[in-house]
Amino acid sequence: MNLATRRRVRRTSRLVAKRALLLCILLYCTSFGFTQVLFEDVDVLQRLALRAELGSRAVPAGVISLRSGVILTTRARVTTPTRSLFPPELFWNCTIILSVRSHRLNSAFLFSVLSGNRIQLGLEISPGKLTLHAGPGNAATFLYNLHDGRWHHLAFVINGRSVTLHSPCSESDSGVTQELPVLPERLNPRGTFRLGGSSALLPGVVPFEGAVCQFDVVPSAQAQQNICSAIRRQCRENDTYRPAPPALLPLPSRHAPPLLAHTLPPNRTFTFTPTNFLLAPVNGAGGSSSVRMSDGVRPKPSSTTPPPLALMQTGIDAPLSLSLVTHKPSLRTPKPTASKPGVWLTPTKPARPKPTPGKASPKLNVSKSFGPKPTARLAASKLGSKAIGPKPTPLKPSKPVKKPTSVPKPNPTKNASIGPRPTNSNKKQNAILKPLPAPKPTVPKRPSPTNKKPLQPKNKSHTTPLTPKSTLAPNSTSKKPLPTLKSTSFTTAAPNKPPKTLETPKVNPDKSKTPVPYSTPRTPRFSIQSVTLPAFDDFQSFEVEPTRFSLLVGAPGLKGDQGESGLPGPPGKPGQPGMRGPRGPPGPHGKPGRPGPTGLKGKKGDPGLSPGKAPKGDKGDVGLPGPVGLVGVEGRKGQKGHPGPPGLPGEPGEQGPVGEAGAKGYPGRQGLPGPIGPVGPKGARGFIGIPGLFGLPGADGERGSPGPPGKRGKMGRPGFPGDFGERGPPGLDGEPGVIGAPGPPGVLGLIGDMGPAGTVGVPGLNGLKGVPGNMGESGLKGDKGDVGLPGEQGEIGFQGDKGVQGLPGLPGPRGKPGPQGKTGEIGPSGLPGPPGPEGFPGDIGKPGLNGPEGPKGKPGARGLPGPRGAAGREGDEGPLGPPGPFGLEGQMGSKGFPGALGLEGVKGEQGVTGKAGPMGERGLVGFIGPGGEAGLAGEKGDRGEMGLPGPPGEKGSTGHPGTPGEGGPPGPPGSPGSPGSRGPIGIRGPKGRRGPRGPDGVPGEIGTEGKKGPDGPPGKIGFPGHAGKIGESGEVGPKGFPGIQGPSGATGDKGIAGEPGPSGPPGTLGPQGNPGPKGPAGKVGDSGLPGEPGEKGSIGLAGNAGAAGLIGARGEPGLEGEAGPAGPDGTKGEKGDMGTEGEQGVRGDPGIKGKDGPPGDPGLTGVRGPEGKSGKSGERGKPGLKGAKGNIGHLGETGSVGKIGPIGTTGPKGSRGTIGHAGAPGRMGLQGDPGISGYEGHKGPQGPIGPPGPKGAKGEQGDDGKVEGPTGAPGLRGPVGKRGDRGEPGDPGYVGQQGVDGLRGKPGAPGLPGDPGPRGTQGPKGSKGEQGQKGKQGQQGERGSRGSPGVVGLPGPRGTVGREGREGFPGTDGLAGKDGSRGTPGDQGDDGEFGLPGKPGAPGKVGVIGLPGPQGSFGPKGERGLPGHPGPSGKRGFKGGMGLPGPQGDRGSKGQPGDIGEPGFPGMLGMFGPKGPPGDFGPKGIQGPKGPQGNMGRGGLAGPVGVIGPIGNPGSRGDTGNKGELGVQGPRGAPGPRGPPGLPGPPGIPLAMNQDFGLGVVQPVFRETHTQKIEGRGLLDMPMLDQAPEILRTLDYLSSLVHSLKNPLGTRDHPARLCRDLHDCRDTLYDGTYWIDPNLGCSSDSIEVMCNFSSGGRTCLRPITTAKLEFSVGRVQMNFLHLLSAGAEQRITIHCLNVTIWSHAPNQPPSQNAVQFHSWIGEVLEPDVLEDTCWQLNGRWQHADFLFRVLDPALLPVVRISNLPKVMPSSRFHLEVGPVCFL
């Protein structure tokens, strides 16, 4: 080998050694960086995959994911193993950083770490305090009020036993330190971490409801000086657009605790200025960046660049300190100034931008995403990881990092970002911004000049330029011109209502009046609130079910225009592969890292010294990395490492060949939404979608101007049958109808009374042997047996030796009480004896008598605003207020009443008969017209010819089940029938009710003590399986042809006997037993414990009138209450003063003498038209020619009823007429008598949202809401009130002026009777007229014919309770009486009987004008008076009543959508409107829950004919079969011959009765007598008026049953499933005893429980007795109760006397002889020992309290206690079992 070769080899070997050394250094630094990353901060929300940026996983139920955090609702259940969040090295030396806001005032756990059923770490948020739990009984409490609706940034610094609470970013934050009582134990890695939810099972703990923006755990307690920089930027900016506190939270307190010094008073605003940071480019290229923080100094950017590993060369602690110092790289953000108001972005339809040339300006821009475009990657630090997402991976120092060229996909989410619009003129493609799963901090470039003008929205209203200092959202850049927002609000041209705007604190440092409204966004629109800050992503679009804090729900907006699809970006470069981590919670997926080279085996160390002798060595310096060793033996598989940081995104490889189809993989996670594709072709009509959630009611628009009358519409479809009214009075007896076909079986009737004893039947055949029944439940312990008879006396034994003195005997049984001895003399008082042992707790005594009323307590603190109370009684009419200012000109009034009849026109000439027109084409089938009125009895027609037999009709549908008929008379006893064939074995009867509890049995012998089994070996941890590849989705195959009908199967074998059926109906009441002998008098018992609250007592006598209270604040609107029952009839008013006597009037026509009635008060006379004179009979004219068919005339005015004309002669038979058109609907008639109130109708679907009204003028700034405003102006006239009491007689009216004699009109043609119109409102009181002149003598009128007797009217409804009278004047003071002797307090007397009515009092002053009385009966018709002179114009009257409907006008053109109106005040509850037309069929509802098992169904329809089988062998002769059922109804027969006309029918149904039934006017289609029976006529064709009451009764029962299921009452007949259901349905219930039925079966097995609503609706079961572990709940009900609950707890106390129960010393583990508690499923439970004093064997009663809290409710209640101590003569114990409460 020559020299050159030798040198080359030596040089090569040196180079290889250097490279190896460099590689070792790189590997060491990389591994060191990885270890540092693994032990860095823990972002809990990111580890739980709850960040909105992590779109790869759906969030759990009850969690609403936002870009700035999450919102936890009551249904949130987020759990994960502890080891997946916190590494094992994390001990009690860390900092917990939180940014939360509470939505509900309660005591809740934000998070908890559980080990089994013990809590190891948890934060409890209570009103006014925060409690950090570090184990059972180990907690630190801080006075801090978090329930004020604001965002709070907190930091808990835990250092051993010391816990310090900091409120970062405040000037006065010095921290409050508390000491834990005990050093907390290490976290169990096998424990469970829970976020939100009622997981801690502590008393009074409910799920946390609120928002969490940040939840980080930093493993260092020395980081409190940099906590403010650790708060996320978007969390700190949450304060700048915080919404108003919800209605569920109180206003912020004026007296905040000292720790809240940094918070602001309610009337101040909170502005935030982010800290400025220096962003220095690296290598001058801007490809990567290094971020540092300066304290208050803003250095200029420099071009110097540290090496890539500069952050790692400072030592071990450098990355940790950097993680705390350089958390929040941010852009320079300007402070909000007073001159630049905030931005209000409301939902809008994005306008299409128009690009125009021009310059870019840093105006406020809006894009559809917030996401940053990564332009740099940081080196070996966690810069921005808290603000954006996952941690960055340390870079290798061998290569400088270049700017990634990959362009992210467009983000379909429609959010908004604000910032400048930097452009790059070198690139032709515009990138669309989108947040990556792991975005990194970037440095935005300055906007460069370009040739494109910023895009502007079309709407230019309310344009106000924003500050030019606004920049992009931090960590984001943009390369596409974005639309510039130049307005403070987006307006919309779509006719939808925007969401209601809530008041928020104003954000203006100079107290300018610029409100910053808060909008409630809904998908898919975007809505943003901000105050000139660059990023606002607090609320993202989402759908929320209606909750108490529905702050984020608004009305749905319009669909936006289709966005342009983005261009695909170039492929990215290959990323750095990350290390393979353990299978943790789903996070950002990184690629597995390459395995590193195995190191050399180290040298053998020196032998160690024995323990205790070796001195503790100092910590050595970090050694240099050794040389690379040889490859060692393959080691064992190591434990799972911590999850590694995600690797850089790799460059997609080339398209590989298509592989074979793999096995079907698990369903993948939900992928990120792809880019918006081009607009596709119009698809086919889809199915009706699932109904969406009802939106909040929009603001009431202003009343529009009345439109022009529309054209007459077409006849609508027949409406659905209306709601059934109440049962009306019995009608007249109808004629017997045709006997119809037997109806279907009716509704199962109620259990009838026991009938008379029937005849003894023929004894049946002996039955087969029954199937052996199931094993019955073990019976209760029997009573102690009676003492046996004494045995025969044995022989007398020999006398034994004197024995040794025995031990003291056991105390003998207590003897019977002897006879009462004579009272002895009082002896000397003895010395006080020693205190005796503690007695047993006595049984619960009977409720004691109510104690005397205690002294009046001090006024309590003002409580939270309660729910809206029920509507109070109508107050007295207030005094007449001062005249208000003249109002604006009113709108055009409604159409007035029809005018008087015009003069009769001149009779026209007789027309010429027209020619018969050609036969028209057949018209369309018309709608079924409304039933016409009953016509007059027609004349008898000729007998028609026999018609051809019609074809057989189709089979009719099964009719409705008939109502059960009344029981007929008992029939004669039938002859004994032949013995029938043996019937099938009946179903086993239902299980009977549980019998009463038997007496206590004899105590059993103590069993032998069981041995504790050995602990089993721990199982091995399995290896995680490889995830299968996701196969390509196959194409959808063509739809197959329907298969051929298979042959019918053979008859199955006889099934085995079923399980016992449900419990049967209660048996009949047995005969009353003879009274037992009187027992001996018992001893007087001890005074019992205070009883449970008794039932509500009867209403006491009315108290004295109290002093007038102050005017209360206006209450919140309450829920709509149910209609109350009609009140009793008011007392009759006193007779009013006599009016002034008028002049004698003209003698009227003699009327028909009526019955002498009582003198009634004058009622309001209704409006009635004049009655015309009877005209002279004209001569009979010649019969005219037949005229052409005329058009349907207009509806005539209602004329007076004419006299009954003479019976005409029989006319010729007319030809069969065609079906006439439906008549026009009659006018609205007078209001009828009020009908009986109907049943409560079902709630109809919510109507569509109306078009927006015109925009109202912007209101002025309102006054402070706390200051009581002035008395409002008198409101508008309300709707017509209920019928009031009869008013007092009014003042006599003024005499009218003399009128001019009018001509008497001719009688008008009788018009069609119109429907009764609505009752008009009472007009204003007229002015008093002057005395009129005496009228002329009228002509003598003709005597009218006697009218037919009217139908007896229905009884009117019960009147409402009259108003309360005014308070009388105080009487004169009487003389002072003498002091009487003090009497002994008597017992409370019974309620006295109602006294006799007192004497009428002195007449009071003239009261206010009463409500209008009921409409009086029509008086005798008077003559028409003379028209008076027109009086002076009166004042502007109130708004008139609703006029008659005018003719329908032409359809107007569609108006422009109005502007958004201001929300009006809530209106008064209106009268029930007329029933609306039936709505369209709604979409198919969501599938409901599985219902209970139904009754045995009827036989199904016959199946298809099967294949003809082979001929079978002839069977044996069978028994005689039972009588077959009634066959199917045959085809409808041909119509029979026309019969003679029937007799006149009974009178029609009164109008009130028709309204009561709600069926409209029921008109009989035709009448027939009992002689006219048409064969084949079905039952359904008959009028069902006689069946309507029964149908109504059935519907009422079903309606009440459904209502009780939806709204349980908690009674025995209407039980709830759980107490939680009662708590959710009714907010006003109190703790007490209620009935529940967890399986929702028959209410007979419902159980009585205690409901604790104050702690969230707990269901508590009490044992039968407190001394035994027995509960009167069946296993089935208990299983359902377990399934419906989320946890349970129970408390058991063991009272002990000289016996050890748990441990032998305080605070010691349980001894081997400790008692064991067995759960409901047999497992041994470990209790929480609250107190144990049984180790004290001092001859006194002690006790041990055990508490069981479990997450699995199936473990409780405790059913058995084993290993109880043996009872000795000097030791005793007994149990006190508490109730078990289910959550």
From Swiss-Prot:
Q: Where is the composition biased (Basic and acidic residues)?
A: 1131-1158, 1170-1182, 1257-1267
Per UniProt, the ranges with Pro residues bias are 436-447, 967-976, 1537-1546
Biased amino acid composition, Polar residues: 462-494
Q: Where is the Laminin G-like domain?
A: 73-235
Kindly indicate whether the keyword Oxidoreductase belongs to this entry.
Answer: no
Q: Where in the cell is it found?
A: Secreted, Extracellular space, Extracellular matrix
Region called Disordered, residue ranges: 288-312, 327-524, 553-744, 772-1461, 1512-1546
Domain Collagen-like intervals: 554-608, 818-873, 845-902, 986-1043, 1269-1326, 1446-1503, 1497-1549
Q: Which residues form the propeptide?
A: 1551-1783
Alphabetically list the UniProt keywords.
Calcium, Collagen, Developmental protein, Disulfide bond, Extracellular matrix, Glycoprotein, Metal-binding, Repeat, Secreted, Signal
Intrachain S-S bonds: 1619-1651, 1660-1781, 1696-1734
Q: Name one GO biological process term.
A: bone mineralization
Expressed, tissue-wise, as follows: Expressed dynamically in the notochord from late epiboly, spreading to the anterior notochord by 24 hpf, and then throughout the notochord by 30 hpf. Subsequently, notochordal expression becomes restricted to the distal tip of the tail by 48 hpf and is no longer detectable by 72 hpf. Also expressed throughout the floor plate and hypochord at 24 hpf, and in forming head cartilages and the first forming tooth.
Give me the glycosylation sites of this protein.
1698
Boundaries of every Fibrillar collagen NC1 domain copy: 1589-1783
Output compositional bias ranges, type Gly residues. 926-935
In what ranges is there compositional bias, type Low complexity? 403-415, 622-633, 651-661, 735-744, 817-829, 861-870, 978-988, 1098-1129, 1334-1349, 1396-1409
Q: Where is this region: Triple-helical region?
A: 553-1547
One example GO MF annotation: extracellular matrix structural constituent conferring tensile strength
Signal peptide segment: 1-35
Q: Which family does it belong to?
A: Belongs to the fibrillar collagen family.
What is the purpose of this protein? Answer: May play a role during the calcification of cartilage and the transition of cartilage to bone. Together with col27a1b, plays a role in development of the notochord and axial skeleton.
**Record's domain comment?**
The C-terminal propeptide, also known as COLFI domain, have crucial roles in tissue growth and repair by controlling both the intracellular assembly of procollagen molecules and the extracellular assembly of collagen fibrils. It binds a calcium ion which is essential for its function.
Q: What is this protein called?
A: Collagen alpha-1(XXVII) chain A
